[in-house]
Amino acid sequence: MNGVKSWTVTLVFYFLILAVLIANLDGSSSLFGIIPKRANSSQKPPHLHLQQLGITGSRLLRFFQDNLLEFEGASSLPGDEQPGISLYYDSFKKYLYDAPHGPPRPLECNPDKSIVAKLTKDVQPIPVHSHNDYWRDLPLFQGIAHGAISTEADVWIYPKPTNADTPEDEYILAVGHNEVFLDPVHRTLDGLYTGPLADMLDQVNCVEGHKSGVFYDSPEDTLFFYIDFKSQETHLLYKLLMDKYLKPLMDKGYLTYFDLESKKLVWNQITVILTGDFPKDLGVIDNGENGYYNDNKRYAFQEANILEPTALEPNASVVSTSSLSNLLEKCGYNERSILSQGQMDNSLTKCIKSLISQSHEAGLRTRIWGVPNWPVSFATNLWHQQVENLGVDLLNVDNLDLAQSIF
């Protein structure tokens, strides 16, 4: 009998030791609530402490990329909750909105603790257009954090998701490059762009009569916001854009506009450019003669063509654009000829500069798209030539890190 008791005690002691070892190996919080978990000296600060990081811009992006999974609450979501855009995007946005473990806190007008301060304090605005911005890991935020003064969203008309609280016959504007891969739940124009822009501007425009944009150290700079029309129903798309997505920004005075009475352009925090298959008729743009909102103001500007800068009616545009291939053809060149030289020669730069100058004389800024981005040395040579020799106002850029490094 004593032998049985002895073996029983031995087995209990053996299993207890085994359980302690397993608990230490798998990181369990405790052993049946009896033996507390040993403190981990290498444990990173919780996600909540990120509110005091003090780093901004591209450094902030790299910090999140390198440390995302190290922070409490960032490596997993509660229950069955799934990432909306991605774990990276969702966690980054929660940091910006000062809400690491729950819904965003009510926005307060406090420039020093604003989203704008977290993103762009000590960031120099650069003459860059964030091409295909909606493809980036952090749409809108990534371009702004690098100082890009222009962004872009491709939009499609899409039926409301079945779980929405609105009638099924209404539509939303989904953001994406290809209609097949649209996500009308998470990737919408208001979710990715107009909503965050309104939140950012609300936090820094505290004093009436004082305008502040998305760049903390250059609050007077506007953000060019390209809306690329993808759906064939252009008039409906424009109506949705104006009625549902831009009106909240207009109501708060955040949109650049052309005064149809005084014939003056008034710059504000966001300048909307229509590109792609947008309506060409100003009667549609202005909804008649008194402006779309019947206030004698034009809030959306048609993209002009560098090769025909005066083809549109005066004051219909603020930016003209052309592909590099069209400019090369106009000047009697092709891409192969400049690739072999590694840059544009004097004759070509003189020709393109004359075209750029025509746009400038018409009061238009300029952007050239379709510029090769490889080899890297060739791409950077063309960037320098666009800015220094041609006078291009917006560089069309995919690689934001590389572009930021040359300014």
Curated annotation (Swiss-Prot):
Highest classification ranks of the organism: Eukaryota, Fungi, Dikarya, Ascomycota, Saccharomycotina
Signal peptide start-end: 1-23
Keyword Signal attached: yes
Protein's UniProt name: Altered inheritance of mitochondria protein 6
Top-rank lineage group of the source organism: Eukaryota
GO biological process: lipid metabolic process
Keywords on record: Signal
Gene Ontology terms, MF aspect: phosphoric diester hydrolase activity
Matching PANTHER family: ALTERED INHERITANCE OF MITOCHONDRIA PROTEIN 6
Family label: Belongs to the AIM6 family.
InterPro entries: HAT_RTT109-like, PLC-like_Pdiesterase_TIM-brl
Protein encoded by which gene: AIM6
